Amino acid sequence: VTPRAAIQQIARMVRDDIRSGELSPGAHSVGEMLAAQPEALLLIVDLTGAEGRKKRPDAAMHHAYSFMLGQALDRLRQRSESGNGHATRAMENVRAAIAQQMRSGKLAATAAMALVSAFSRAGIEVGEDIRSAMDHAMIQTGADHQNLPPPDAAEMLKDLVKACEGDPFLIQSQFAELTAAMPVGLQLSLLEGLVLADDSSLREAAIGWLLAEPAIATPLASMIEETARQGLVSAASVTNLMLIRNWVSEDRRAAIDAIIRAARVVGSVPEKRRAIQVRELLISERDGAGAQSIFASIKQGRKNGLVSILIKQGHGVRDAWVAPSLSRPEIEDMLDHIASEMSVHETTAEDTAFILSSALADGSPNSPPPFGLVQAITLLGLSDVAAKSVSVEDLVALMLSDADAAATDAKAVEKAVRASGRWLATNPQLDSWFENGDDVAAAIKGRRKIEDRIAAIIDKVLEPNRAYWASVIAWSAFAQRGDGHDSDWIEMALVAREMISERPLTEIPLVRSIAMQTVEAART
């Protein structure tokens, strides 16, 4: 079977899974397989174009290719964020292939939209090359934003509201996927339809783009401010805007404040929150890539739901979603599955707000959090979650402030450091604690002996990144302390503090363990 035929076969399997409404284990694992073979992603682009050129293209195959690409891009993004240059280049090559095939006429706009939506789902910027190619394709077909048929747009929005059952956050997510590759002018034209819509759920969804790039957010803010003066900004939107204003730069905050003032003049005030019961609140330990998750089982009225938030060290809040209208057994099954995949611990609303505030400060000012975080925070019953930077020193000091002196004295520190060499044997979560950036290959190049490689990793990779690993360890301790096993999390907090001290890394057994796992990962 040729690689091309193999990709087609996988796509048919995914298509059938999508039609059945349930993804098979094979579909779930396709992303990892494709990410390991970047050339296969270019085949997906080519096959999507070929499907679109058929007399009767199969839209379900487009969805399948989009799913496969999205799964692979998500894996590549994670690796790229960890400094893996191969992953970064693979994503750039996919962008270039899509743009090139669009310009050559091999990839129709509808097929391209299916592929580009994968970038949006994976949390990756589409890029100007694709937007320019999309603009070119639309001009060639006479479908630029000046010629967009309003009835079609109105019908699309009506169908979107129905499919999303009026959920503004789901509407925003789905609409963002549809418009990600569109030129800014066309996006703003379509967003104006949301801002001026009769349906309040569309207007509430529109404020999500105040977290988009400035070219979108700035003119959109002016549109929404004008409608606020007309009483078209709801109380729910005012409540959401008061959260969002804390997550953006000062210039954006001024524009959002202007919307809030205009809405209040005509009587729109923050709505009273509905009673929400948080049945279970869990937090994972931080993995080697810096990822940490929060999960919550909630009840709102008669409905049960699951809230999930993903934090990424150095990148802030990467994702937030809510699965509403689930049964309690379904939620329990999902949480059981999560617990089988990672170490999770009970936590409190106060600690959740604390780590989210830290994550918001940790992200790039140019990359605000996803709009779904507003919904997640609201359903968790949190309020006024604003960016607040927390250093490792301050975090450790806070955690240890109530600990017994005997548990944190010099003797306890040495005991914790010695014990750190055994952590990997007792905590499966730590299997992910290794480096996989380009600096690893450079460090071990020309070194054949394992001990030489380990020494090089410690000296040339882990030493420059000791602050990163101190943060990973400290936030893992923060997660563990909710279980009440003081000795475990206190040991971890003490080792985190040693990581940012002047103590040689060669004296910390955990560091050697991380280096050994890094060497092993580099061999695979």
PLM regions and their residue ranges:
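Non-catalytic terminal/accessory regions
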Residues: V1-A205, P214-R229, S234-T524
